[in-house]
């Protein structure tokens, strides 16, 4: 899909996979995004590398584990710092609300449910196209 906007979806280290992440992937594909799924428990530098390699406009991070918040904040900041200015970051998952302050400080989107995720992707899709 050369003409479609691209996104990368992954979970940070110490994260587990959930059905929620798979449902978000289905929503993204149904809207028309070209999706690259990296997996769960992925180091932040590999997520950054993959996003640049596929020229992703959006990086989606699934956060479902309440542990290691300080490390995850560091990793999300690193991804934000290394991301191109055209890349948006969206946090999804059951624990994403714990990162509201990070969202405000670093212009990172948080989607609490599938509907808000779909609306965020549709808005970004219209801006990219």
Label the model's feature ranges:
Residues 1-71, 75, 82:
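Conserved binding/catalytic microenvironments
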Residues 87-94:
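Short beta-strand elements of ligand-binding domains
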Residues 94-129:
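Peripheral docking tails and interdomain loops at the edges
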